[in-house]
Amino acid sequence: MSPPLELDYIGLSPPPPPPSSSSAAAARADDVDLKGTELRLGLPGSESPDRRPAAIAAAAATATTLELLPAKGAKRVFPDEAALTPPTAAAGKGKAAREGEEVGAEEEDKKVAAPPQPAAKAQVVGWPPIRSYRKNTMATNQIKSNKEDVDAKQGQGFLYVKVSMDGAPYLRKVDLKTYKNYKDMSLGLEKMFIGFSTGKEGAENQKDGEYVLTYEDKDGDWMLVGDVPWEMFTDSCRRLRIMKGSDAIGLAPRAGEKSKNRN
């Protein structure tokens, strides 16, 4: 830089000598340097007198091409499969994915909203309270015991049977196994009841006031005693009845037919 000029504001000192040509050239060079370092709007150095036009054009071209080229290491916007997948398939996949997400969200909401249900308690029935499974067990055992009793009675030929007589105000119960045949049973019943006979002979030769011994078999039919073998009678007899001879008419033929069918 040139040395500062001394100015005579009062007018006492003589005027300064004119600057030489060398000092003027140095001053112009300083002005050029200052102008190059000034702050301006625009590209740096675009107005610098020392910058060549070719360099300016190259810088401008580089600036425009940088915007079009991707950054180093950046990924492509779409994968290679996107170019090969048709738009409809891509749209379908996107819709299915959205629906799956919505369904999953709804299930999660239901799980959160619905509280866990308490365990169901066994039903209490009866008094005192008996739980249902115990009731079922008791019913099963009762049915089983009843079935065993029936089987035992059938196997033993209903050992004890009730004996009734028309006009008698009471019933009796006898054990058929204590008798060996019809005659023994008839003698035993005569001690309990009087005035009856057994078999077809008693039904055919009946008189007023005579009684006939009948029985009820497994099928619920009433038959005359003495029409079937003793063993068959003891196995099928359920009940004995001493009825009047007039009421026993018609039982003998049925008993004979049934005996033939069994044989």
UniProtKB/Swiss-Prot annotation:
Sequence similarity: Belongs to the Aux/IAA family.
Tissue specificity of this protein: Highly expressed in flowers. Expressed in roots and shoots.
Q: Has UniProt tagged this entry with the keyword Nucleus?
A: yes
Give a short account of what the protein does: Aux/IAA proteins are short-lived transcriptional factors that function as repressors of early auxin response genes at low auxin concentrations.
Protein name (Swiss-Prot/TrEMBL): Auxin-responsive protein IAA3
Disordered: annotated span: 1-54, 76-121
**What residue intervals hold the motif EAR-like (transcriptional repression)?**
39-43
